Amino acid sequence: MDKQIPKFEITRSSLLDQCKSFLPELEKANQTLLEHPDSQQDVQNLSDESNYIEMDLALGVLEKQPENSISEDTESEIQANENQGTLEHLMNLYNSRDREKGNEVTLTDFLHEKLSRAAQADLEHEESASIDQDEMVAIETRKTKK
């Protein structure tokens, strides 16, 4: 008694084809950037004539606080925070903390520090992950040019 396995026809997705053609182009562009880090390309001032990909990033940062902590925001600060975007609110909180130290932090520095901390936390949770301490120090101490 032979049981035949039913065969299903799978159609190719046009999205899959687009991804397969786009990813090698992206890899080639990344390799070019790695080979020429000081290239003439200014990503902040692109003309309308050149093609580029713009990616929007949404990042949320929550810091765990004790339940018995009292919010230091006054009513006016809360109202002001509602009128600005989430990223601006986070930057203001971050800069208000660092103003006491006399530092003004750029958005790039802010994101770099938060992403580095998140990556470090992920590495600490993975028991099998191993990273060279010199690499970690280099990641933490690297500053972007302003």
Curated annotation (Swiss-Prot):
GO terms for biological process: box C/D snoRNP assembly. One of its GO terms (molecular function) is box C/D methylation guide snoRNP complex binding. Residues 119-146 are annotated as: Disordered. Residues 119-128 have a biased composition (Basic and acidic residues). PANTHER family: NOP PROTEIN CHAPERONE 1, SIMILAR TO DNA SEGMENT, CHR 10, WAYNE STATE UNIVERSITY 102,-EXPRESSED. This is Uncharacterized protein new4.
